[in-house]
From Swiss-Prot:
The gene is Segment-4. It is found in: Virion. It comes from the Viruses. NCBIfam families: seadorna_VP4. This is Outer capsid protein VP4. InterPro entries: Seadorna_VP4. One of its GO terms (cellular component) is viral outer capsid. Keywords: Capsid protein, Outer capsid protein, Virion.
Length: 576
């Protein structure tokens, strides 16, 4: 934007200046646009510089926002084309256990990246404890979102090392990837899964796994949209850095548990139900309503939300304990009467947020219903469940974060751990039922192919994570991996596979704990080398060097490396 600079003469009277510029200090520059919206008059060079700088920042933000939307749209179109090409009714052969393994590994890698970033964030908060405590104690008047931005600013600007600051720096769209992956990493995961689906399509037979993989991917991606938003509910009521860290860990643990269930749903032989919206065929201005039946792929609960005029009601139901995956089970929480028998036009969609996140907004909207129009109620709700975009109404957004924190705290009206575990048990029983039905109909061989017993959930599936080199030291490329934290207890082992240019190259593993480390020398290549076996107790802790740990850090040092992968395998799992 070209700004108009006007020089002032000492001979000009105040009245003549006003007549030239107008009372709002703007002036037309002869263009059609300036006739509609006159440009600001710049009084001096500093003001001109600031105007130009602000304009550039606004332009960059707008451009980045558009690019981010284009990336998401491109990804969505790729998957739409994939579904169109293969067809909704085509059933993929899940003898492709390899494909499910790749899907699980892609999910696990992204999950690991997010956990590693959470650990870095917690370390930065601890390093800046005084500053963080000051923000939490003194900035009570601002919203949770603004307080979260302040905290992230502190973390990014005062981190003790360049690498740590880099991990907390904003990505291309101005979003701090605290709980990464960002949109770019999400696309990498998408590429992995697209490859997996394409390879599996060669073995097309009669399973609905193409739709399942697509649905699980979209749901899995949902927790990575605007990832830094997760810090907002954690910061909304925290009074100290210790409380903030505890809140972050609680929120993340719940997201990870929901991801486990999302993966498991794709392996039991049931069709994953879509969410849908029902609205009147001929809606009128005076008697309008909309009904939302929400089946999040992730997690164990679903919702029915009804907007009738300017009133909002909801009910939370279990997604387990039914004879069909498309039905709801028992009522878990009631927020008014809803009527699922309403008839009208039905629109299917895939929910982009978890039941916990959707419920937090629903509860906030119910509180604010008297101050919002029906259009605002519907608009805020739909953009969140469809796009994971938070409302731009700051008071509503702040209240949503408070409810999100409540739902993840010990005072939550819902016992999420109980329902998640019940969901796991029900999915196990559904798998047995579906397997027996297929065995009677098509025989044991077909049943073994279509409902593989070895895939239950991410907890007891062997998964791999391909590492990326972080730095070079004395000719060695250093790869880092976070071992843990664990949501389950039992025995677990970790193996490393190394490929190098030189078959005789030795490589080294360093396992780092609180007060010590362990160095392991290896030379075997191209096959898994076990480096660690741990016993995790029911508190999610393991003993290393005589002390309990909830996580360890692994570093792998390799010369002339081609690839380094880590395999994780639960030997015996006892629960969650």
């Amino acid at each position: 934007m070209a700004w108009v600079t006007q020089a002032y003469s000492s001979g000009l009277s105040q009245n003549s200046i006003i007549s030239l510029t107008g009372n709002d200090r703007t002036v037309a520059d002869g263009t059609f646009n300036s006739m509609i919206m006159p440009r600001a008059v710049i009084a001096n060079e500093r003001e001109h510089f600031m105007k130009t700088r602000i304009d550039k920042i606004e332009h960059d933000l707008s451009r980045n926002a558009k690019q981010e939307m284009m990336d998401r749209q491109s990804l969505a179109e790729d998957y739409s084309a994939l579904n169109l090409a293969v067809g909704q009714e085509i059933k993929l052969d899940i003898a492709t256990q390899h494909q499910l393994n790749r899907l699980g590994s892609s999910m696990y890698k992204a999950d690991h990246e997010r956990e590693a970033e959470l650990t870095d964030l917690i370390n930065r908060i601890r390093e800046n404890e005084v500053t963080v405590n000051g923000i939490l104690e003194n900035q009570k008047a601002i919203t949770a979102a603004e307080r979260a931005d302040l905290l992230l600013e502190v973390v990014a600007s005062t981190a003790k090392s360049v690498s740590a600051a880099g991990r907390a720096a904003a990505d291309g769209s101005g979003v701090v990837p605290v709980f990464g992956p960002s949109v770019a990493n999400g696309i990498k995961v998408g590429i992995d899964i697209a490859d997996s689906v394409a390879e599996a399509a060669i073995a097309v037979k009669e399973s609905g796994i193409i739709t399942q993989l697509n649905d699980v991917y979209h749901a899995f991606q949902s927790v990575h949209v605007a990832p830094n938003d997760i810090i907002k509910p954690a910061a909304v009521v925290a009074g100290t850095s210790t409380e903030l860290i505890g809140n972050l860990q609680a929120i993340y643990s719940r997201l990870r548990s929901h991801s486990d269930i999302g993966f498991k749903k794709a392996t039991v032989g049931d069709v994953i139900p879509h969410s849908y919206m029902v609205k009147p065929v001929n809606s009128t201005e005076y008697a309008s309503w909309q009904l939302y039946v929400i089946h999040p792929v992730q997690g164990s609960l679903g919702l029915v939300v009804q907007v009738m005029g300017d009133a909002l009601t909801y009910n939370v139901f279990a997604q387990y304990g039914t004879t069909s995956a498309s039905e709801f089970g028992k009522t878990v929480l009631t927020g008014g009467a809803t009527n699922t028998a309403l008839e009208g036009t039905k629109v299917k969609f895939q929910t982009k947020v978890t039941a916990q996140q959707a419920l937090a907004l629903t509860m906030a909207l119910k509180d604010a219903a008297s101050m919002l129009s029906q259009g605002e109620l519907i608009g805020y709700f739909e953009q969140y469940i469809n796009l994971a975009l938070e409302p731009d109404n700051l008071s509503l957004q702040d209240n949503m974060h408070k409810y999100h924190h409540l739902l993840t705290s010990q005072n939550s009206p819902i016992d999420w751990n109980y329902h998640d575990e019940e969901m796991h048990k029900w999915l196990d029983s559904r798998k047995i039922t579906n397997y027996d039905t297929m065995k009677q109909k098509d025989g044991v061989v077909i049943a073994d192919i279509h409902i593989p017993k070895v895939f239950n959930d991410l907890r007891n599936t062997t998964l791999h994570c391909k590492l990326e080199g972080k730095q070079n030291i004395a000719g060695y490329t250093v790869y880092e991996y976070l071992i843990g934290p664990w949501a389950h207890y039992g025995d677990i082992d970790y193996s490393v596979v190394v490929d190098t240019l030189n078959e005789e190259t030795k490589w080294y593993c360093e396992i780092i704990g609180i007060d010590g480390h362990l160095i392991i020398e290896k030379s075997v290549q191209h096959k898994p080398e076990k480096i660690l076996e741990l016993t995790v107790n029911d508190d999610g802790l393991t003993s290393f060097k005589g002390k309990n740990h909830d996580r360890l850090k692994l570093k792998v040092y390799v010369k002339d490396s081609l690839a380094v992968k880590v395999f994780r395998n639960w030997i015996g799992i006892n629960g969650t």
